[in-house]
């Protein structure tokens, strides 16, 4: 078994693509309008219609499916929810030069929970992990992490 994709429902597709494609450098791989009986059946929403875009990190890995529901209109997450809020809380993007990413995204107005921190123990032998959490435009927590090999 593998993870095929994760899904984020958003309020504004362009604002979200500006974050994931323009700021984070992901590439857009698919763009379609979802509508018809099949989407109504799978979502349980009468007259469901959604704009669907897939993005993917240049380094490969899991795709992100971004949906903006046209009908019914999506409901918002609690703004800037903290990492201890129950439910699916974050996904992680491994980067090189975490400090540069933090500076770049901070300068672009991205909201961070904290600056990068170092995990005080090794999850994998010989690898030190540094990370920070930021919020995407819809409040989804995105972990940026780097693994420093010793």
Predicted features by range, described:
Residues 1-5, 50, 86-88, 129:
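Short, solvent-exposed beta-strand edge segments and adjacent coil->beta transition regions
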Residues 36, 71, 148-150:
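A short acidic/small-residue loop/turn micro-motif
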Residues 9-61, 125-127:
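Core segments of cupin and vicinal oxygen chelate
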Residues 61, 72-73:
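Active-site/binding-pocket entry motifs
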Residues 66, 81-84:
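Helix-adjacent hinge/juxtasegments
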Residues 8, 64, 92-150:
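Vicinal oxygen chelate
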Residues 36-41, 73-78, 119-125:
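A short, acidic/glycine-rich surface segment
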